[in-house]
């Protein structure tokens, strides 16, 4: 495992080393907006809300249909491994059942219940991902089918244990747009796979809170932009340059961290650094979650960010992915990256941690959308990946090839259908 912090050293570096994308339709990852909000009570820094949208490229052969044209079929979900704070509960379907009532307990005798999981109506599905659990704990679960005449008998008692390792925790919360969807089990399992991948990569003992949605609207209810396939919203803290750089230097733990720190500028390139709430905590700054489910920010907001998949886009939640479908797992990972802290506006006026490692050649920085710009942690000597410089895509993402892509990285500025991949 690695240290989450300077990736924006390793986060940045790990992400492009893991490919993802494919042929047919392509997705351009669009402009990001930075909307200022009030400073949360108890927080040391002013905040804003940052929005990122992924958009379908009409040249790629796929158009996102109107909101009322949802064509995704019911997918069969497979079991996914536990994360540090979640398990996937699964059961056999009962013929004629209208739905199932789920119990989850810390005790095999069910003399106590995990909050909310006592006769929880999970709908007519065959599984549910249970989140916000304790690390390394065993949980017991059972279900009862129900019909119009009432509930049936309990299933056998089953059990699952959360991952006992320490490190990064991503607490996933599922919006009702997911839990009420016929594909809820497949969607939740896909998100759980994403979380498991990230937790296996990063050892920093911090917790990131993300709300996941599957809808045709943004968190505040307005329609997603035409052609949008996915969106992320997250809180951004405006941290004085010296404060952020000092925290970054102090948090060095690996040789990559040391190389990256050695390449930091001797003089400030901007007055403030805009770091996501998760990225700020990764370097031990006071940047708590502060986003509410409606996309607003303020005191007591429980989320670091919100990830929305467009429910009218041709997504597939299981693999292998059909050539005509976009891989939901790849798209979800991209938006998780944004919540964790990746992103750039290629401007010193909106300076982000990623911009600290943006170069045009050895010893020559470039934080503009002109010319060549690439990621390097050794002063530009090694070009790890080129940044996108096209206004049609997100300036914080990787330069992308035409579909089919030879290097289909998760963080590419355009996505292609039919070829899944993951961060690694």
Positions of predicted regions on the chain:
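Extracellular zinc-dependent metalloprotease catalytic-domain scaffold
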Residues: 164-331, 338-424
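Ser/Thr- and Asn-enriched, surface-exposed coil loops between beta-strands
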Residues: 80-88, 122-127, 314-315
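Pro/Thr/Ser/Gly-rich low-complexity, intrinsically disordered linker/stalk tracts
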Residues: 40-45, 49-53, 57-96, 135, ...
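Bacterial N-terminal signal peptides
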Residues: 12-24
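N-terminal secretory signal peptides that target proteins for export/translocation
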Residues: 1-9
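Recognizes extended acidic, P/S/T-rich segments that occur
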Residues: 101-136, 148-149
